[in-house]
Design a protein with these regions (language model features):
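Internal hydrophobic scaffold segments of catalytic domains
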Residues: 1-7, 151-174
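Conserved phosphoryl-transfer catalytic core
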Residues: 1-53, 180-193
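Acceptor-substrate binding/catalytic loop of class I
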Residues: 30-42, 197-203, 224-230
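Mobile active-site "lid"/loop adjacent to the S-adenosyl-L-methionine
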Residues: 35, 160-206
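SAM-dependent nucleic-acid methyltransferase catalytic core
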Residues: 40-156, 162-165
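Short amphipathic alpha-helical segments
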Residues: 52, 167-170, 237-239
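A short glycine-rich, Lys/Arg-flanked "PGG" loop and its adjoining helix->strand segment in the class I
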Residues: 204-220, 239
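Class I S-adenosyl-L-methionine
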Residues: 229-275
Length: 275
């Protein structure tokens, strides 16, 4: 139905059975400054029309995921800068990702359609291999979260990199669209705090709190794998303060990044073990 609504947006009502369309459709009066800044008017209308229709369906969480993916892709930002755009793009620009002149994105419909079919495909593929195993997701501050009924053989994690990304801001479209609680003031190592000595020390202190907390539920000799960009060499002290031994450190270049720039980026994987 979003396709029909989109056609209604693009053509005068009298050309498309005016009685029918006037009865069922209306433009959304969106005053949200974030959407007005980062999205074209057509995209805004399509996104909020789809959101309005979600409540009529059973699998609402799946539809919200589809819409969230579509909203991320429909922002008026350069194709090569999906993670940290500085400002919206309102005119044609040279795209280093596609190596040609690209235009600002005007619609959300094509992304809604693309991700709908992609999601169906993924669900069908997963259904063929899924087992009776269960997964429990606990949302909380890892410095404080309590996991009293559990014990773990190990951890595999990739914490935020100090001063690199404002993760809440990167996904602001979802916070604004679904009215999620914003806990950006709790974010560890955000770009907004920079990479000063004070910021690095605060980051290190926060990560020590994280691993000391979760260590309470780790079995003896538990294995910990941490994917990091540790150019400041912060993790040896983190391991020491948490009573973890460093078993090995693996290094690798990162070749397929979200940002299509020329910045050389590498990561390390720390293999630690609880003493």
């Amino acid at each position: 139905e979003t396709k029909v609504f989109s056609k209604w947006l693009l053509k005068p009502q009298e050309e498309l059975f005016p009685g029918l369309y006037k009865k069922f459709y209306k433009r959304f009066d969106i005053k949200n400054e974030y959407f007005k800044t980062w999205f074209a008017e057509r995209a805004i209308q399509e996104i909020f029309f789809y959101r309005e229709r979600i409540k009529e369906y059973k699998n609402q969480d799946i539809l919200k995921v589809i819409l969230s993916r579509a909203a991320r892709s429909a922002r008026q930002i350069p194709h090569y800068d999906l993670a940290r755009p500085a400002k919206p793009v309102k005119e044609k620009y040279y795209c280093i990702k596609h190596k040609r002149t690209c235009e600002p994105i005007e619609e959300a419909l094509k992304f809604i359609d693309r991700y709908s079919w992609d999601t169906i495909k993924r669900i069908k593929e997963f259904d063929k291999i899924r087992t009776s195993a269960t997964i429990k997701i606990i949302q909380g501050d890892s410095r404080e979260v309590r996991l009293n009924k559990f014990s773990f053989d190990g951890i595999f994690t990739s914490p935020p990199y100090v001063g690199l990304i404002d993760y809440h801001d990167q996904h602001k479209y979802a916070y604004e669209l679904f009215d999620f609680s914003n806990n950006d003031f709790k974010e560890i190592g955000p770009a907004s705090k920079g990479r000063s000595q004070q910021a690095r020390e605060e980051y290190q202190c926060d990560l020590i709190k994280v691993f000391q907390n979760v260590s309470n539920w780790l079995k003896p000799k538990a294995k910990i794998f941490i994917v990091v960009n540790d150019k400041d060499n912060l993790y040896p002290k983190i391991a020491e303060e948490c009573n973890f031994s460093i078993e090995e450190i693996f290094h690798r270049p990162v070749l397929m990044r979200t940002e299509r720039d020329n910045y050389q980026f590498s990561e390390s994987i720390y293999y630690l073990k609880k003493k």
